[in-house]
Protein backbone atom coordinates (compact mmCIF):
# COMPACT_ATOMS: atom_id res chain seq x y z
CA UNK A 1 0.00 0.00 0.00
CA UNK A 2 1.17 3.52 -0.74
CA UNK A 3 -0.56 6.57 0.74
CA UNK A 4 -1.18 9.52 -1.60
CA UNK A 5 0.72 12.69 -0.63
CA UNK A 6 -2.16 14.95 -1.77
CA UNK A 7 -4.66 14.48 1.05
CA UNK A 8 -7.66 15.27 -1.18
CA UNK A 9 -6.75 12.20 -3.28
CA UNK A 10 -6.29 9.80 -0.34
CA UNK A 11 -8.52 6.79 0.14
CA UNK A 12 -9.29 4.90 3.32
CA UNK A 13 -8.25 1.23 3.31
CA UNK A 14 -10.92 -1.14 4.59
CA UNK A 15 -10.31 -4.84 5.12
CA UNK A 16 -12.53 -7.75 6.08
CA UNK A 17 -11.83 -11.29 7.22
CA UNK A 18 -14.27 -14.17 7.15
CA UNK A 19 -12.34 -16.51 9.37
CA UNK A 20 -12.67 -20.18 8.48
CA UNK A 21 -15.50 -21.01 6.08
CA UNK A 22 -16.87 -24.55 6.30
CA UNK A 23 -18.46 -26.13 3.26
CA UNK A 24 -20.50 -28.75 5.07
CA UNK A 25 -23.54 -29.41 2.85
CA UNK A 26 -22.88 -30.32 -0.77
CA UNK A 27 -24.69 -27.99 -3.17
CA UNK A 28 -25.32 -25.36 -0.48
CA UNK A 29 -23.15 -22.27 -0.30
CA UNK A 30 -21.62 -21.80 3.14
CA UNK A 31 -22.48 -18.75 5.23
CA UNK A 32 -19.70 -16.17 5.15
CA UNK A 33 -19.74 -13.21 7.53
CA UNK A 34 -17.48 -10.23 6.93
CA UNK A 35 -16.57 -7.69 9.59
CA UNK A 36 -14.93 -4.64 7.98
CA UNK A 37 -12.16 -2.69 9.71
CA UNK A 38 -10.11 0.41 8.94
CA UNK A 39 -6.46 -0.49 8.31
CA UNK A 40 -5.23 3.13 8.39
CA UNK A 41 -5.19 5.93 10.98
CA UNK A 42 -7.44 8.94 10.36
CA UNK A 43 -5.88 12.30 11.30
CA UNK A 44 -7.94 15.45 11.97
CA UNK A 45 -7.09 18.93 13.26
CA UNK A 46 -9.10 21.03 15.73
CA UNK A 47 -9.00 24.41 17.49
CA UNK A 48 -6.82 24.23 20.61
CA UNK A 49 -7.13 26.30 23.80
CA UNK A 50 -4.84 29.11 22.57
CA UNK A 51 -5.29 29.43 18.80
CA UNK A 52 -5.52 33.00 17.50
CA UNK A 53 -8.90 34.13 16.23
CA UNK A 54 -9.44 36.00 12.97
CA UNK A 55 -6.88 33.89 11.12
CA UNK A 56 -7.29 31.62 8.12
CA UNK A 57 -5.45 28.32 7.66
CA UNK A 58 -4.13 27.99 4.10
CA UNK A 59 -2.07 24.80 4.36
CA UNK A 60 -1.60 21.77 6.64
CA UNK A 61 1.24 19.28 6.18
CA UNK A 62 2.45 16.14 7.91
CA UNK A 63 6.14 15.90 7.15
CA UNK A 64 8.52 12.92 7.18
CA UNK A 65 5.81 10.26 7.71
CA UNK A 66 6.27 6.85 6.10
CA UNK A 67 4.17 6.41 2.97
CA UNK A 68 4.60 2.75 1.96
CA UNK A 69 4.01 -0.53 3.72
CA UNK A 70 2.85 -4.11 3.40
CA UNK A 71 -0.43 -4.99 5.09
CA UNK A 72 -1.01 -8.63 6.00
CA UNK A 73 -4.65 -9.64 6.43
CA UNK A 74 -5.78 -11.68 9.37
CA UNK A 75 -7.23 -15.14 8.88
CA UNK A 76 -9.50 -14.67 11.91
CA UNK A 77 -12.97 -13.17 11.96
CA UNK A 78 -12.05 -10.76 14.78
CA UNK A 79 -9.11 -9.39 12.76
CA UNK A 80 -6.38 -10.37 15.21
CA UNK A 81 -3.07 -11.01 13.55
CA UNK A 82 -3.43 -8.32 10.88
CA UNK A 83 -0.27 -6.23 10.73
CA UNK A 84 1.73 -3.57 8.92
CA UNK A 85 5.38 -4.23 8.10
CA UNK A 86 8.21 -3.12 5.81
CA UNK A 87 7.29 0.56 6.23
CA UNK A 88 9.39 2.90 4.08
CA UNK A 89 9.64 6.09 2.04
CA UNK A 90 9.25 9.18 4.26
CA UNK A 91 7.22 11.88 2.51
CA UNK A 92 5.30 15.10 3.10
CA UNK A 93 1.51 14.82 3.03
CA UNK A 94 -0.15 18.08 1.98
CA UNK A 95 -3.53 19.70 2.29
CA UNK A 96 -3.23 22.96 0.33
CA UNK A 97 -5.52 25.69 -0.96
CA UNK A 98 -7.49 25.86 2.26
CA UNK A 99 -9.49 28.77 3.63
CA UNK A 100 -10.36 27.41 7.09
CA UNK A 101 -11.21 30.07 9.68
CA UNK A 102 -9.92 29.79 13.25
CA UNK A 103 -12.95 31.74 14.56
CA UNK A 104 -14.41 28.69 16.26
CA UNK A 105 -14.72 27.43 19.80
CA UNK A 106 -11.92 25.34 21.31
CA UNK A 107 -12.16 21.67 20.26
CA UNK A 108 -14.10 22.49 17.05
CA UNK A 109 -12.77 20.25 14.26
CA UNK A 110 -11.16 22.31 11.47
CA UNK A 111 -10.22 19.51 9.06
CA UNK A 112 -11.79 16.09 8.72
CA UNK A 113 -15.44 17.11 9.01
CA UNK A 114 -18.10 15.11 7.16
CA UNK A 115 -17.91 15.92 3.46
CA UNK A 116 -14.84 18.20 3.50
CA UNK A 117 -12.38 15.53 2.24
CA UNK A 118 -9.69 16.95 4.56
CA UNK A 119 -8.95 13.84 6.64
CA UNK A 120 -5.38 12.55 6.46
CA UNK A 121 -5.34 8.73 6.04
CA UNK A 122 -1.94 7.57 7.27
CA UNK A 123 -0.18 4.22 7.57
CA UNK A 124 -0.02 3.24 11.26
CA UNK A 125 3.49 3.90 12.58
CA UNK A 126 5.63 4.90 15.54
CA UNK A 127 6.09 8.68 15.77
CA UNK A 128 8.35 9.25 18.78
CA UNK A 129 11.94 9.94 17.75
CA UNK A 130 11.14 9.76 14.01
CA UNK A 131 11.15 13.54 13.36
CA UNK A 132 7.59 13.47 12.00
CA UNK A 133 6.18 17.00 12.16
CA UNK A 134 2.96 18.91 11.58
CA UNK A 135 3.21 22.22 9.76
CA UNK A 136 0.29 24.67 9.60
CA UNK A 137 0.45 27.87 7.55
CA UNK A 138 -1.91 30.84 7.78
CA UNK A 139 -2.77 33.40 5.09
CA UNK A 140 -0.99 36.12 7.11
CA UNK A 141 2.30 34.20 6.76
CA UNK A 142 2.41 32.95 10.36
CA UNK A 143 2.88 29.24 11.01
CA UNK A 144 2.75 26.49 13.61
CA UNK A 145 5.22 23.61 13.52
CA UNK A 146 5.39 20.75 16.01
CA UNK A 147 7.10 17.37 16.28
CA UNK A 148 4.71 14.47 16.86
CA UNK A 149 5.10 11.82 19.56
CA UNK A 150 3.35 8.56 20.31
CA UNK A 151 2.05 6.30 17.57
CA UNK A 152 -0.72 5.97 15.03
CA UNK A 153 -2.76 2.78 15.41
CA UNK A 154 -4.87 1.09 12.75
CA UNK A 155 -8.59 1.76 12.93
CA UNK A 156 -8.28 4.84 15.14
CA UNK A 157 -8.76 8.58 14.68
CA UNK A 158 -6.22 11.05 16.07
CA UNK A 159 -7.31 14.68 16.47
CA UNK A 160 -4.51 17.19 16.95
CA UNK A 161 -5.52 20.46 18.62
CA UNK A 162 -3.74 23.51 17.23
CA UNK A 163 -2.50 26.10 19.74
CA UNK A 164 0.07 28.87 19.77
CA UNK A 165 2.42 30.13 22.48
CA UNK A 166 1.34 33.69 21.71
CA UNK A 167 -2.16 34.22 20.37
CA UNK A 168 -4.17 37.31 19.44
CA UNK A 169 -6.69 36.74 22.20
CA UNK A 170 -7.39 39.89 24.20
CA UNK A 171 -8.99 39.62 27.61
CA UNK A 172 -11.01 42.39 29.24
CA UNK A 173 -12.04 42.08 32.86
CA UNK A 174 -14.72 44.43 34.10
CA UNK A 175 -15.43 44.78 37.78
CA UNK A 176 -18.35 46.34 39.54
CA UNK A 177 -18.66 47.34 43.13
CA UNK A 178 -20.70 44.83 45.06
CA UNK A 179 -24.14 46.05 45.98
CA UNK A 180 -24.76 46.60 49.66
CA UNK A 181 -26.89 44.00 51.34
Where are these regions (language model features)?
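Short, low-hydrophobicity acidic/polar segments
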Residues: 1-56, 106-112, 158-162, 169-181
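Cell-envelope/extracellular anchoring and linker segments
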Residues: 3-23, 51-107, 147-148
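Residue-level recognition of well-ordered beta-strand positions that form the cores
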Residues: 46-48, 61-63, 135-137
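Exposed regions on extracellular, virion, or secretory-pathway luminal proteins
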Residues: 80, 88, 102-105, 113-114, ...
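Short Pro-Gly-centered beta-turn/loop motif in secreted/extracellular proteins
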Residues: 116-129
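A short, solvent-exposed beta-strand micro-motif common in secreted/extracellular proteins
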Residues: 127-139
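Edge beta-strands of extracellular beta-sandwich domains
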Residues: 143-151
